[in-house]
């Protein structure tokens, strides 16, 4: 790769977990293998990462957490986690990818073979995300198509899906009061539950396939496929539009939102600080998990995207800018959301706490209800769902791209040949689509909630981030990694980053992880429906299937490597000798011993493709 420096032969070679290119490829195959590729320019990388990390959670999760956890006071724990965990781990993953030029699995193999399970765990999480995250796009597409009508279908109770319990509450409200209707539902709720989902009584009854959602899901996958089928050459171009267009929509909705009556009261609810809430550990846990969710940490995406950078790209500045952009977007989205919720509160004459929602409830219930109260409701509905689609679309196709990158880097001989990449993406898309069909059945919402609550939960991300920072800072060596970064960008990053890797980030991650376990409450759909025991078993399987990769592959690699235990351990924490080294390598002054362990025997390695790809 551009700018890489050959390793000096000053000591025994480090363990090689990925076969050398000459060993992997026969001469006759080399002509058929495509180059790995790089971003054409820095902007493609920045927009691709921005598209991945700036998604639906910025709009429907962060504003609600601020309101729920003390308004402006929530920014105190949020920014503590931002500086101590968010930026350091975000930068670590991007720098790791840029340094190794590998996807998530092979990057960790090269750095520390013993902890290759970190990369495999991230692939598991990526796979789950690719199955269920795109379901939100299918819902949004359904709402978008439904908005092209003379009257929004969730405005009245005169539709074939409505029940006798449907009541338009606005037509029964006086000036500032609402008559209670305990056994009645709103038209927007019935549209969501009966028209879109057709929801059943529980996960035990999946019902039939919602064919309209299945077609919307198919359309979403077709779009994703053609966004990435040519690799970074196509992805880098597509993100110019998909990553910037949502900002135009956000600005339009912001201008509309703050000019609505009642918007000021909604914004006050959003920002009014309640410092007493900081005594609640739950507030701190919410801040920490939000950082990990919104920064796409421990999902393998950042490492894969960073791997397409040029070796001397200044990823440090890029990461800091992207982290601030992500948080700023969340902050601005809060003004959009709560100005509209304030408007709803005033129009309905109810406290804002009764209209505040998060997650799908905000996107598919609260906001659709709000647009029915506005002039030109179809226009605002279309703009909102177009914004949602683009926010989710680039997060989805970048996540698929990262899974493809990890797979190709694991099997370069088989998958880098002409036409193989397109076939691999098609295979992933078809498999995820077929699995996703279970999530667009009448009982699919219950499965979706299991994926969302367990598969990529804060517990999983905190667990993996703890191992990531421990592996880099204490096993590979924070100083050594700083040397590598200095070789790439020309200077050493702010010392707080290294201090965070060594002490602050592991401590906060461990504390938050343990607290999350202690405060665990089983999932309830709508806070009402209790899953059967086998449903929770599926949920915990989704959660543990990623976390177990780390200890499992530590044991497997130790057992499959030959030799005395201490020798095996030393071999498996030795980085790959093919990794680029700083120009002023320590071996030049006779101090190579701290960087390289003893030479591993070829027979003792388990890095070959046949032995490690289980």
Curated annotation (Swiss-Prot):
InterPro entries: Na/ntran_symport, Na/ntran_symport_betaine, SNS_sf. The chain crosses the membrane at residues 45-65, 73-92, 117-137, 211-229, 238-255, 291-308, 320-341, 374-393, 423-441, 458-478, 499-518, 538-556. Glycans are attached at residues 171, 183. One of its GO terms (cellular component) is plasma membrane. It is a multi-pass membrane protein. One of its GO terms (biological process) is gamma-aminobutyric acid reuptake. CDD domains: SLC6sbd_BGT1 (cd11511). The keyword Nucleotide-binding does not apply. Disulfide bonds join 157-166. Expressed in kidney, liver, heart, skeletal muscle, placenta, and a widespread distribution in the brain. Residues 576-614 are annotated as: Disordered. Keywords: Cell membrane, Disulfide bond, Glycoprotein, Membrane, Neurotransmitter transport, Symport, Transmembrane, Transmembrane helix, Transport. It catalyses: 4-aminobutanoate(out) + chloride(out) + 3 Na(+)(out) = 4-aminobutanoate(in) + chloride(in) + 3 Na(+)(in); glycine betaine(out) + 2 chloride(out) + 3 Na(+)(out) = glycine betaine(in) + 2 chloride(in) + 3 Na(+)(in). Residues 1-44, 557-614 are cytoplasmic. The keyword Ligase does not apply. Interacts with LIN7C. This is Sodium- and chloride-dependent betaine transporter. It comes from Homo sapiens.
């Amino acid at each position: 790769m551009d700018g890489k420096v050959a390793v000096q032969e000053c000591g025994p070679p480090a363990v090689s977990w990925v076969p050398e290119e000459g060993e992997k490829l026969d001469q006759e195959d080399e002509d058929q293998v495509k180059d790995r590729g790089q971003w054409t320019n820095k902007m493609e990388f920045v927009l691709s990462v921005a598209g991945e990390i700036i998604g639906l959670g910025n709009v429907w999760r962060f504003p609600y957490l601020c309101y729920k956890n003390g308004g402006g006071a929530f920014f105190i724990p949020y920014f503590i986690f931002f500086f101590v965990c968010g930026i350091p781990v975000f930068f670590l993953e991007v720098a790791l990818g840029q340094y190794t030029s590998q996807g998530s699995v092979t990057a960790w193999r090269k750095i520390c073979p013993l902890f290759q399970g970190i990369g495999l765990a991230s692939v598991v999480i990526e796979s789950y995300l690719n199955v269920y995250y795109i379901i939100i796009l299918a819902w949004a597409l359904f709402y978008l198509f439904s908005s092209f009508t003379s009257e929004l279908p969730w405005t009245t109770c005169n539709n074939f899906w409505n029940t006798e319990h449907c009541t338009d509450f606005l037509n029964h409200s006086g000036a500032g009061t609402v008559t209670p209707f305990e056994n009645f539902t709103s038209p927007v709720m019935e549209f969501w539950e009966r028209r879109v989902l057709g929801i059943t009584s529980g996960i035990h009854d999946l019902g039939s396939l919602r064919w309209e959602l299945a077609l919307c899901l198919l359309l979403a996958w077709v779009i994703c496929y053609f966004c990435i089928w040519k690799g970074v050459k196509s992805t880098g171009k597509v993100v110019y539009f998909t990553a910037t267009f949502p900002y135009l929509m956000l600005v339009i909705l912001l201008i509309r939102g703050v000019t609505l009556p009642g918007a000021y009261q909604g914004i006050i609810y959003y920002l009014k600080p309640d410092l007493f809430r900081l005594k609640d550990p739950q507030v701190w846990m919410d801040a920490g998990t939000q950082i990990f969710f919104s920064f796409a940490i421990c999902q393998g995406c950042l490492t894969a995207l960073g791997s397409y950078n040029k070796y001397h790209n200044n990823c440090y500045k890029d990461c800091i800018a992207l982290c601030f952009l992500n948080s700023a977007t969340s902050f601005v989205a809060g003004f959009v959301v709560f100005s509209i919720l304030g408007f709803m509160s005033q129009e309905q004459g109810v406290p804002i706490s009764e209209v505040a929602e998060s997650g799908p409830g905000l996107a598919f219930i609260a906001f659709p209800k709000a647009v029915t109260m506005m002039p030109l409701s179809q226009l605002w509905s279309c703009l909102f769902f177009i914004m949602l689609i683009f926010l989710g679309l680039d997060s989805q196709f970048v996540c698929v791209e990262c899974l493809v990158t990890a797979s190709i880097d694991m099997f370069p001989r088989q998958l880098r040949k002409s036409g193989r990449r397109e076939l691999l993406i098609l295979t992933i898309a078809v498999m995820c689509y077929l699995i996703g069909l279970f999530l667009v059945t009448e009982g699919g919402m219950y499965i979706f909630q299991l994926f969302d609550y367990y598969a990529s939960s804060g517990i999983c991300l905190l667990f993996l981030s703890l191992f990531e920072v421990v592996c880099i800072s204490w096993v590979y060596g924070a100083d050594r990694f700083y040397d590598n970064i200095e070789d790439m960008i020309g200077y050493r990053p702010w010392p707080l980053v290294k201090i965070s890797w060594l002490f602050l980030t592991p401590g906060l991650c461990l504390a938050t992880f343990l607290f999350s376990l202690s405060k665990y409450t089983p999932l309830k759909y709508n806070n009402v429906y209790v899953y059967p025991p086998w449903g929770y078993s599926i949920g915990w399987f989704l959660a543990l299937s990623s976390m177990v990769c780390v200890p499992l592959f530590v044991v497997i690699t130790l057992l499959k490597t030959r030799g005395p235990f201490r020798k095996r351990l030393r071999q498996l924490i030795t980085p790959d000798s093919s990794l680029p080294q700083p120009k002023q390598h320590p071996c030049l002054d006779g101090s190579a011993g701290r960087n390289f362990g003893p030479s591993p025997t070829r027979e003792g390695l388990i890095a070959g493709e046949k032995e490690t790809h289980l």
